[in-house]
Amino acid sequence: MATLDVNPQRYQEQLAEKVERLTDMFAPYNVPELEVFESPEQHYRMRAEFRVWHEGEDLYYIMFNQETREKYRVDQFPAASRLINDLMPLLVEAMKDNESLRRKLFQVDFLSTLSGEILVSLLYHRQLDEEWIENAKALKQRLNDEGFNLNIIGRARKMKIILDRDYVIEKLDVNGQSYIYQQVENSFTQPNGKVAEKMLEWAVDCTQESTGDLLELYCGNGNFSLALAQNFDRVLATELAKPSVESAQYNIAANKIDNVQIIRMSAEEFTEAMEGKREFRRLKDNGVDLKSYNCNTIFVDPPRAGMDVDTCKMVQGYERIMYISCNPETLKENLDILSETHNVTRFALFDQFPYTHHMEAGVLLERKA
């Protein structure tokens, strides 16, 4: 992870800069007033990764200055959740005098939750053995005895040792309703838990008066699908990454939601299926008849590269488009196409990444009369 100047005194100032930047960027699209969703000023990141430095008997976390590439010691990290900060010193202290746990350890990854669970991945430049497993189990027990709800994973080249499980269970509150999410180590999850809740509430609010079914592309672990299911008859969602699809299936079952169907395919493949260019056996195998769906609304949350032109054209076929973007530059490019047929009726900034230039935006588009 790189340098981050977490300064609560500067929070409103950096947010105002983003508001101005985003408003100016999208002025040509005749957007409505920007809805702004703030982050906690510190302890907002649910994930953090640190390199580990060995100095004689000492062992500590380090980060690198982005400009100078100089390393510096990190004992606390105000951007990370309180849970991560509470665990950081205890973890390193417990490993310092243990040869099996510290030898060739080069990185520690933390994945925490609002629900209180935390997962630690220990990364090594050596193969791990039975002795490591025994020591890691003792470490886990010791820290859980101190009040943590912790799991540990050991990683080395072509090696992954899971002591109990490689995921955490997160609980996000959406308008007073709690949703359960399995979040697997090394797969994508929203990094800012409190802002993730606000994004879900905004999406639910935008689709309140919906009719028919929802189509969702790039659904990840079902983050939005589950919360949006209440506003639609059925939800058909696609995702390419296998671990995310498996988590989405887990989450559908855990939340007892019966109107969401997830298919493992890319947005590009789905576009071909919708246009009848190709038949996909996995649609048949999953009992999915695309013609039976009555989707007036499409929800997209693409990667940083945005949507390709063909997917944009396919998306234009829907009455309403909800688009969550982690890269306003590519959202702008996509809006050049989408605004030919649709107007932006809602416009939001979610401050997922305070004190950085990154912005997360949301738009609702409705077909022009």
From Swiss-Prot:
Gene3D superfamilies: 2.40.50.1070, Vaccinia Virus protein VP39
One biological process term in Gene Ontology: tRNA methylation
Broad class of enzyme this protein falls into: transferase
Binding sites annotated in the UniProt record for S-adenosyl-L-methionine: 190, 218, 223, 239, 301
Highest taxon above the source species: Bacteria
Catalytic residues as annotated in Swiss-Prot or TrEMBL: 326 (nucleophile), 360 (proton acceptor)
GO MF annotation: an example: tRNA binding
Catalysed reaction equations from the record: uridine(54) in tRNA + S-adenosyl-L-methionine = 5-methyluridine(54) in tRNA + S-adenosyl-L-homocysteine + H(+); uridine(341) in tmRNA + S-adenosyl-L-methionine = 5-methyluridine(341) in tmRNA + S-adenosyl-L-homocysteine + H(+)
Pfam families noted in UniProt: tRNA_U5-meth_tr
A GO term from the CC aspect: cytosol
Keywords tagged on the record: Methyltransferase, S-adenosyl-L-methionine, Transferase, tRNA processing
PANTHER family according to UniProt: TRNA/TMRNA (URACIL-C(5))-METHYLTRANSFERASE, TRNA_TMRNA (URACIL-C(5))-METHYLTRANSFERASE
HAMAP family associated with the record: RNA_methyltr_TrmA
Known role: Dual-specificity methyltransferase that catalyzes the formation of 5-methyluridine at position 54 (m5U54) in all tRNAs, and that of position 341 (m5U341) in tmRNA (transfer-mRNA).
Descriptive protein name: tRNA/tmRNA (uracil-C(5))-methyltransferase
Species this chain originates from: Vibrio parahaemolyticus serotype O3:K6 (strain RIMD 2210633)
